């Protein structure tokens, strides 16, 4: 009998609750201005949101049937959403305590997102390489004689590159530009003391706090940069030695062999990326995840123009053996943005009835981006193959558009001659098909074609 898999080892559907999505601010921001906007006259944090509605958020997770969820306890802005004793740059209410308690009541595995790579807490102003953009690397790995210049230059170039990627994403996906904020706002270089040790001590003190005080199921660290940056390696050693049972992952680690992590993860922001990456990682032997925004982008809160896109992304990734996680933005009063939340809720209701078809299945071991011996006449429909029990499952997923006619699927008899019966899941509705000397032809009536994922169970002789 196969060993029962733990939640992080199986395909699954997750949510990451975002706290960084703020009207009037981009992912890249000028922290001289941002931090000033968040301070009172004594330079203490004047917190104005999001006022996290933790009970509502956990209840949302429960209602839509997520398999796990994540909360951003400290993003790149450095604001801590928990009662830490190592800084006053923290929220008046201990949101993490409520999140942990409510997650346990709901029996939802919960993780903490923690930005290890950037932290714009003003208590680090003296050692902050760049204060006028988000990328600012404390722990860049370099022994170059002009180390401080290299750190600032690399951080600045990274901010430019990220801006180009955000712009291309907006152009290709055709969502409107947010004109209320600029990517760069009065950028400048400022003097700083090169002292990564101060930040590292702070970070490890907080990780110890988070694990011992709130006892999460896992830590989701942002992010991993191969050998360019030190913090990830030190976190691996720290967690392996002190807290090996706490699930650990690093953003952007999926193409690397980490010396200590429970699963790997990276980002996929649209259905095309999910399709390409899902096929790329489908044959991975270790657990993996891909994450993307539930809305248009991390800093754009409008719902995706295609209301089925996030659902199709999730189906692709889970059918490929991975976990699909979506960042959910909240308004300043803590209310989840209705558009993205509605799209995920719709998928959640669909997923509840089909959860076992994903979680208890194993991807077929084939090369390429289509199941051998299966052809679909509709060009926008792709297929993924799994094994569920003793039966092949074929997932038929529209990358674009909606069903407008009957869907014709052809099975080559050389590969599928033993095919005896085809059932439409989860209804177990038997579908008729025809055979000739070379092919088996299945015509799925338009009304039976699912807008998210049409799942066929093949019964073999």
Predicted stretch roles:
Residues 2-461:
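Mature catalytic domains of secreted/periplasmic carbohydrate-active enzymes
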């Amino acid at each position: 009998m196969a060993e029962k898999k733990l939640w992080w080892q199986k395909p699954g559907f997750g949510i990451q609750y975002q706290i960084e999505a703020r009207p009037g601010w981009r992912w890249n921001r000028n922290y001289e201005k941002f931090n000033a906007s968040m301070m009172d006259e004594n330079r203490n944090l004047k917190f104005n949101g999001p006022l996290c509605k933790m009970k509502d958020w956990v209840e949302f997770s429960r209602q839509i049937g997520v398999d796990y969820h994540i909360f951003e306890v400290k993003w790149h802005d450095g604001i801590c959403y928990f009662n830490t004793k190592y800084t006053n740059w923290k929220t008046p209410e201990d949101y993490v305590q409520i999140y942990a308690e409510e997650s346990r009541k709901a029996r939802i595995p919960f993780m903490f997102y923690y930005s290890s790579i950037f932290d714009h807490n003003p208590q680090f102003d003296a050692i902050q390489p760049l204060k006028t953009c988000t990328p600012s690397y404390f722990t860049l790995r370099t022994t170059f004689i002009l180390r401080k210049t290299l750190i600032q230059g690399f951080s600045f170039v990274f901010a430019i590159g990220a801006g180009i990627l955000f712009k291309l994403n907006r152009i290709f996906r055709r969502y409107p530009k947010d004109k209320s904020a600029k990517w760069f706002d009065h950028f400048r270089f400022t003097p700083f003391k090169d002292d990564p040790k101060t930040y590292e001590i702070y970070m490890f003190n907080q990780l110890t706090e988070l694990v011992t005080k709130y006892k999460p199921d896992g830590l989701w660290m942002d992010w991993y940069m191969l050998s360019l940056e030190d913090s990830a390696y030190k976190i691996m050693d720290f967690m392996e030695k002190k807290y090996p049972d706490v699930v650990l992952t690093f953003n952007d680690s999926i193409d690397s062999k980490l010396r200590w992590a429970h699963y790997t993860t990276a980002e996929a922001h649209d259905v095309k990326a999910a399709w390409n990456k899902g096929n790329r990682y489908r044959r991975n032997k270790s657990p993996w995840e891909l994450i993307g925004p539930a809305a248009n982008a991390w800093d754009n809160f409008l719902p995706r123009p295609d209301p089925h896109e996030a659902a199709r992304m999730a189906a692709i990734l889970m059918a490929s053996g991975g976990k699909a996680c979506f960042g959910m933005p909240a308004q300043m009063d803590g209310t989840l943005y209705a558009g993205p939340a509605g799209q995920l809720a719709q998928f959640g209701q669909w997923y509840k009835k089909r959860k076992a078809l994903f979680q208890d299945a194993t991807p077929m071991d084939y090369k390429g981006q289509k199941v051998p011996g299966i052809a679909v006449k509709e060009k926008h429909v792709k297929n993924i193959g799994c094994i569920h029990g003793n039966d092949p499952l074929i997932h038929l997923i529209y990358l674009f558009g909606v069903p407008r006619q009957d869907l014709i699927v052809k099975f080559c008899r050389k590969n599928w001659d033993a095919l005896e019966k085809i059932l439409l899941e989860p209804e177990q509705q038997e579908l008729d098909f025809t055979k000739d000397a070379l092919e088996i032809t299945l015509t799925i009536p338009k009304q039976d074609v699912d807008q998210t994922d049409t799942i066929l169970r093949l019964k073999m002789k």
